[in-house]
Amino acid sequence: MIDRKLLLQDFDKVALSLKKRNHAMGDELERLREVITHYKKQLIELEGLQAFQNKVSKEFGIKMAQKVDTSDLKKELENNKIKLNELSKSVGELEQQIDLKLSIIPNLVDEKTPLGASEEDNIEIKKILTPRVFTFKPKEHFELAQQNGWIDFESGVKLAKSRFSVIRGFGAKIYRALIHLMLDFNEKNGFEIIYTPALVNEKMLFGTGQLPKFKEDVFKIENENLYLIPTAEVTLTNLYNDTIIGVENLPIKMTAHTPCFRSEAGSAGKDTRGMIRQHQFDKVELVAITHSKESDAMQEHMLESASEILKALELPHRFVQLCSADLGFSASNTIDIEVWLPGQNCYREISSVSNTRDFQARRAKIRFKENQKNQLAHTLNGSSLAVGRTMVALMENHQQEDGSIHIPKALEKYL
C-alpha cells in the first residue's frame, strides 16, 4: 500500500504513477480526490475544535480553582464536545474510505522502470547462453512428454478439469530432481529453506497485495476464511507480518517449494495445451526482507541466483526489464527471466524478480528497528524457479531427434 501521507500531500504524484502504468481509474480517482479534499477540510475543522476544547478546559479549571461561576463555560464545553465527537466520527469514516481506495491502488512505479504502454515495450537487458541450432525440427514439450510417457494430460482433466496434469514415471523423477536442485542452489546462495502451509487467511493475502483487488484470481475454501496460495511469496513474506525486526538480522533470505494455485481468470484461450499455464503448479520461490538501502542490490542477487540454476541446466535465457504498463500490482520494479523454448521458437517467462520497496511492508506492517526508530522494510520476491516451466525448457532444449531427452550433468546426481 502506498503511504497515505503521500496521497494527501502529493496526489498528483500518485496520479502520474497510475498514468505510467496505463492504469485507468478515471472517475474513481476523481472521487478519491474529492474525498481527500473533504477529509482535509474536516481535519482542519477538527483540529480547531480540539484546540478550542483544550483552551476552554484550561479556563474552566482556573475558574473552578478561583470558585468563580463556570456554568457558561461548562455548557460551552458540552456543546463543543458534541460537535467534536460528531466530527471525529466523520473524519474516521473518511479515513476508512481513503484506506479502502488505497488498498486497490498499485505500487508507485520506480524511477528505474522504463515507460511503456504494453509488454511490447519491455527491454531486453542481456542474453545468457546461445540457443542450440537443431538439425531437425524441434518438438514442443507436450509432444515429447506424451511420447516419453512423462505427463498425462487426459488424467489431469479426468481428476479435476482442464489445466491440470499428472506427471509420472521418469518424468516424475526429473520433476522431483529439479525441485531438489533448485533448493540446493538457493540454500548455497544463503536462502533458508522453509516449508509453509498451502492455505492462508485473508489477512495474509491482503499483506502481499492479492486481496482485495484480485479476489477472482485465487481459490477460496468454501465456508472458511482460507485461500489456496497462488505463490509462496504470500507465506514467506507474511511470516514477518506485524513484526519488528532488529536491523542486525537483516537481510532475511528465504526459499520455499510449494504447490501454487491460480484460477487463471482472463487467460481463456492462452496456452491451452501443455504445462505452461496450469491451475496447480509447483514453484520454488525466493523472498527477501531488507533494509530500505539494500533492496536494489538484493534484486540483482536474486536474479543471479535464479540464473545460476538455468546455467547449470544448460538452458539459454535472457533478462528482460518490464516497462511501467507491464508491472504487477505490488511491484515497483520487475526484471523477468525468460527461457528459450525451441519448440515454440521464442523466450517464455520462467521467473519474475520484483522489488516492492515498502509497499507490501506497509500493508503487512513489516518493520525493522534502527537507532531506536522503527522503519518500514523493503520486500522482494522471485521464482527460482517455476518447476513445470523448467521441465518444459529442459525437454525442449535437450531433446534428441528420436524424442529422447539428454539429462544435463548438474541434474544427474539427483536422479
From Swiss-Prot:
PROSITE patterns in the record: AA_TRNA_LIGASE_II
Function: Catalyzes the attachment of serine to tRNA(Ser). Is also able to aminoacylate tRNA(Sec) with serine, to form the misacylated tRNA L-seryl-tRNA(Sec), which will be further converted into selenocysteinyl-tRNA(Sec).
Catalytic activity, as annotated: tRNA(Ser) + L-serine + ATP = L-seryl-tRNA(Ser) + AMP + diphosphate + H(+); tRNA(Sec) + L-serine + ATP = L-seryl-tRNA(Sec) + AMP + diphosphate + H(+)
Protein name: Serine--tRNA ligase
Originating gene: serS
GO biological process, one term: seryl-tRNA aminoacylation
Binding, L-serine: T231, A232, E233, E285, S383
Residues reported in the UniProt entry to bind ATP: R262, S263, E264, E349, I350, S351, S352
